[in-house]
């Protein structure tokens, strides 16, 4: 999924959650209750709304009593279940105010909780009575005495209590400041460690992708939080219509099945599957676009079939043990860029039922020789004379960067050669780093200036109607384009010649979502980065 916002808005239906939730209802009865409450209130009495309906109350205690009796939401149980103290409680209240989740969702949450972000310290409602509630009373209930010790008046006792609370608040703020400072030191240490470490360990059964921490992987997921990349992907007709045709033309694969959509984005594949007759569809995505996806699902009245879960597939807890079908649009530039296939294979190993299927199921990567002397000169020879100055040293920075662009088919000078065949049902994560010898049959005498790579996608297993699409330069262009590896020193080739070479593909050791590609060709070796 070469797509890369924040979709979290303070409206009903945008919930940072692990499930797609039905929208709360504002019934006429609730409005009537609110009117009755307003009529009975003294003028100027401060009110606060219920967390789950429109009723108003004049104290936190009344509000929580109502939540417990009418909505089966017990704040005492919630605080103890998650070990919430002052700041955790504040975040919880603001999270509910901002995201409007259902009671069922709130009662189903387990750690990690979705209200940990600093943004939930900001009050949603001005003068919210619930934020003035002392959550520590839930841990240490105290009885209010009817007489005051040592001859203190009631006012004096209140003042002393306020001083005690102020001191406790200052202590908590100081502790939070120290915690933030420690956290920053830890982050800096982790960044320094990553930048100075060349090797990540990886076994054949696990992926370094699964081990990435939030601060390491945040840029990747945040890039998918903006609508723009999803618009680009949805408008890619080759991509989107291929998935649609595969699903709609093979409904037997989805009828009454439980389907998992890994990296669901806006939910388009989940909705295709639901329309094809799936019994249940689970969409998982870590990016903020999931909040818009929740609204999209409700707008299309598919919330009874589709459940959306926010988080990494390696970390979330699905509401089912096994699924029948896994679908995902995981492909990146040169197929493997972004390493999202690692996550799909993780999901397959953990959740796919025996006899289940993963789609797309077959993928191939191919190379082809390119001759485009003008473009090579524009990007490489350009540095030999820049306004009369020599800048040839810049070539060392330009050449190692793979270029993603749409090639003119007329620049192709060889037949393609496959270098990798992936069957998603049998491939392991370790197979995604590989070396391959290749031979390119030259079709036209010319100068070879670059080698280009692209991939083809197949929906085949159990399909009555097979669907295939290509990202090659001779096919309709897609948002994946082609990946071009410019040669430092072009060389001549003759028609009919067999140009032999070797390619090695690895994850970047410092950024495993990026790729390192090494080409050996014409007695020369060059390493390229795709990032």
Curated annotation (Swiss-Prot):
Record: active site: 329, 338
Any one of the GO CC terms: cytoplasm
Annotated region (Interaction with ZNF200), positions in chain: 48-71
CDD domains, sorted: AdoMet_MTases (cd02440)
Known role: Protein-arginine N-methyltransferase that catalyzes both the monomethylation and asymmetric dimethylation of the guanidino nitrogens of arginine residues in target proteins, and therefore falls into the group of type I methyltransferases. Catalyzes the asymmetric arginine dimethylation at multiple sites in the Arg/Gly-rich region of small ribosomal subunit protein uS5/RPS2. Also appears to methylate other ribosomal proteins. May regulate retinoic acid synthesis and signaling by inhibiting ALDH1A1 retinal dehydrogenase activity.
Documented effect of changing residue 465 to A: Loss of interaction with ALDH1A1
Pfam families xref list: ANM3_C2H2_Zf, ANM3_zf-C2H2, PrmA, PRMT_C
Keyword Zinc-finger among UniProt keywords: yes
SUPFAM superfamilies in the record: beta-beta-alpha zinc fingers (SSF57667), S-adenosyl-L-methionine-dependent methyltransferases (SSF53335)
Site (Not phosphorylated) location in chain: 87
Reaction(s) catalysed by this chain's protein: L-arginyl-[protein] + S-adenosyl-L-methionine = N(omega)-methyl-L-arginyl-[protein] + S-adenosyl-L-homocysteine + H(+); L-arginyl-[protein] + 2 S-adenosyl-L-methionine = N(omega),N(omega)-dimethyl-L-arginyl-[protein] + 2 S-adenosyl-L-homocysteine + 2 H(+)
Region: Mediates interaction with ALDH1A1, residue numbers: 186-531
Acidic residues composition-biased segments: 16-39
GO process terms (BP): chromatin remodeling; methylation; negative regulation of protein ubiquitination; negative regulation of retinoic acid biosynthetic process; positive regulation of osteoblast differentiation; regulation of DNA-templated transcription; transcription initiation-coupled chromatin remodeling
Modified residues (Phosphoserine): 25, 27, 171
Keyword rRNA processing: no
Cited Gene3D superfamilies: Hnrnp arginine n-methyltransferase1, Vaccinia Virus protein VP39
Activity control summary: Inhibited by N-ethylmaleimide and high concentrations of zinc chloride. Allosterically inhibited by SGC707. Allosterically inhibited by (1-(benzo[d][1,2,3]thiadiazol- 6-yl)-3-(2-cyclohexenylethyl)urea) and derivatives thereof.
GO MF annotations in UniProt: histone H4R3 methyltransferase activity; histone methyltransferase activity; methyltransferase activity; protein-arginine N-methyltransferase activity; protein-arginine omega-N asymmetric methyltransferase activity; protein-arginine omega-N monomethyltransferase activity; zinc ion binding
Name of the protein described by the UniProt record: Protein arginine N-methyltransferase 3
Subcellular localization: Cytoplasm, Cytosol; Nucleus
Record family assignment: Belongs to the class I-like SAM-binding methyltransferase superfamily. Protein arginine N-methyltransferase family.
Limits of the SAM-dependent MTase PRMT-type domain: 217-531
Subunit organization: Monomer and homodimer. Interacts with EPB41L3 (via FERM domain); the interaction is direct and inhibits the protein-arginine N-methyltransferase activity of PRMT3. Interacts with the 40S ribosomal protein RPS2. Interacts with ALDH1A1; the interaction is direct, inhibits ALDH1A1 aldehyde dehydrogenase activity and is independent of the methyltransferase activity of PRMT3. Interacts (via zinc-finger) with ZNF200 (via C-terminus); the interaction is direct and required to localize PRMT3 to the nucleus and inhibit its proteasomal degradation.
Leading EC class: transferase
Impact noted for substituting residue 87 to E: Markedly reduced affinity for RPS2
Gene source species: Homo sapiens (Human)
